A protein has these predicted regions:
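Eukaryotic N-terminal low-complexity, Ser/Thr- and Lys/Arg-rich leader segments
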Residues: 1-18, 24, 78, 147-151, ...
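Glycine-rich beta-strand-centered segment in the early N-terminal region that forms part
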Residues: 20-39, 50-94, 107
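Short, glycine/polar-rich helix-capping loops at beta-to-alpha or helix-loop-helix junctions
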Residues: 96, 189-198, 258-262, 282-283
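C-terminal hydrophobic helical "lid"/dimerization subdomain
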Residues: 280-332
Length: 332
């Protein structure tokens, strides 16, 4: 099969080569023909900086987001040959930057019926990260998504801020918070993306080209928020400490918030760094919302398989609006 490979973990250089079609070996292995995948910013550094997690034995195929068709499944599996599926493959196993991949049954969900393969490939990592940040790691009531009025009322009293709001994860945070009935949804973005972020459901905007988060909250302390989802790290994570209320939550997918606490900030807040859990059952919940036309993936651009390098280059350069997707098969 054709596969994208990262030959040297110290370099972002990728090559397209031939590899054997993977053979199911784990009891949960499902063989899938890949139709599309999507790069993740930073994934080409994982093997270098997290060797305890990304072992040398991993075949270095990137692209952990998968959209494809089932070719074989374990006996008794809920998935059958021909099913259209999607998944986030655990980062310590070969990804979907190849014509075939082996997601685990626990990672898979049926593809949303109203999405194309391109849109489907843009969904798993970003939506799971946002969903789990808000409802598993965060303090939002997930029952609100199913219409529970008590949960909606609880969420309506909360304020949520997300950094890099136009990013793939940020756009999902805003949409899911909106659907959960959150009263205040604050997006940090650039001037050119303000209209886009408002269209997704943001009620307030911080234009980082005009002011940072700490300046924004210093102008009016009533702007403090209950939950911050940091998707970018760096100075934004440090500034977030000024905006979180006493007893609130800071959740980052980029670093440990406590390590970024500015000097002089003594407020008590819950903080955590977490890695996404590739749960197919969470994807099932997201699928229901997608099929009801309540949320949608945002696709920045699409790259052909043979031009794969452009996709990773664009993602690593930053400032994308949504996901960059790589077409693997001709079936779209």
């Amino acid at each position: 099969m054709k596969a994208i490979i990262q030959p040297d973990k110290t370099s972002h250089a990728l090559i397209l080569t031939q590899k054997p079609i993977p053979i199911p070996a784990h009891p949960q292995d499902v063989l899938v023909r890949v139709h599309a995948t999507a790069p993740c910013k930073g994934e080409l550094d994982w093997a270098l900086y997290a060797p305890e997690y990304i072992l040398p034995s991993k075949i270095p195929i990137p692209g952990q987001d998968l959209a494809g068709s089932v070719l074989s499944a374990p006996e008794g599996s809920k998935f059958k040959i021909g099913d259209s599926v999607y998944a986030r493959i655990e980062a310590n196993r070969p990804g979907a930057g190849a014509e075939y991949a082996l997601p685990r049954e626990s990672e898979l969900a049926l593809k949303p019926k109203n999405l194309s393969w391109i849109e489907t490939a843009a969904t798993p990592l970003s939506s799971l990260t946002a969903y789990q940040a808000l409802f598993t790691q965060g303090n939002l009531c997930v029952a609100a998504l199913a219409g529970d009025q008590v949960a909606k009322n609880t969420n309506a009293s909360l304020r949520v801020l997300v950094t890099s709001a136009s990013s793939s994860v940020g756009s999902w945070v805003i949409q899911l918070a909106r659907e959960a009935g959150v009263g205040g949804i604050i997006g940090v973005t650039s001037t050119k993306n303000i209209g886009f972020i408002r269209s997704l459901g943001a009620t307030e905007i911080i234009d980082y080209m005009d002011q940072d988060i700490s300046d924004w909250v210093a102008y009016d302390q009533s702007r403090e928020v209950d939950l911050i989802i940091d998707t970018i790290g760096g100075p934004s994570l440090a500034y977030s400490w000024h905006a979180v209320r006493e007893g609130g939550n800071i959740i980052s997918v980029c670093g440990f918030p406590e390590q970024s606490r500015p000097e002089g900030v003594t407020k008590k807040a819950n903080s955590s760094f977490y890695l996404v859990n590739p749960k197919g059952t969470d994807l099932d919940s997201i699928t229901h919302l997608i099929e009801a036309d309540r949320v949608k993936p945002i696709v920045d651009s699409v790259v052909e398989f043979d031009d794969f390098a452009k996709a990773w280059e664009k993602v690593e350069a930053g400032h994308t609006r949504g996901k960059v997707v790589v077409k693997i098969s001709g079936e779209m």
